[in-house]
């Protein structure tokens, strides 16, 4: 996924990774990313772009380094990350998705016994194996859904 808020280059493309075995994909916009960036830099984070997604990934990495679970990290993010967004973030142990409490950005999940797929719209998943028997749903706003951790 290419950036839409910063320079449209491969450096600004998703997924973002700011920690070992961590990545984040983001659809939306953070209005407080500059303030959050300054706070994270004071804590030792290093950023390589002006992209708000890199700041969100840094927030996740910082929280995970303080021994928070991925689910707890994204739950805290609901109050700390101001904006409209859907985040998908993964670690070596699992992955999670969260939509902001207003749910301005679309998301759909297809869950089977063999896989979990997440996209902005169902059409992106229409040709997946066994999708017709999948549990398909829109994640509720302000709720963190996690798998494997």
Model segments located where?
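Conserved short alpha-helical segments that host acidic/polar catalytic motifs at enzyme active sites
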Residues: 1-149
């Amino acid at each position: 996924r290419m950036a839409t808020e910063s320079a449209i280059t491969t450096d600004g493309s998703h997924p973002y990774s700011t920690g070992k075995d961590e990545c984040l994909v983001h659809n939306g916009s953070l209005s407080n990313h500059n303030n959050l960036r300054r706070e994270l830099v004071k804590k030792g984070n290093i950023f390589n772009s002006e992209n708000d997604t890199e700041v969100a990934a840094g927030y996740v990495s910082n929280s995970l380094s303080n021994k928070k679970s991925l689910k707890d990290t994204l739950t805290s993010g609901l109050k700390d990350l101001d904006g409209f967004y859907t985040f998908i973030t993964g670690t070596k142990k699992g992955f999670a998705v969260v939509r902001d409490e207003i749910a301005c950005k679309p998301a759909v999940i297809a869950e089977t016994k063999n896989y979990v797929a997440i996209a902005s719209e169902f059409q992106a998943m229409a040709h997946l194996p066994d999708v017709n028997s999948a549990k398909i749903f829109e994640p509720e706003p302000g709720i963190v859904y996690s798998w494997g951790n």
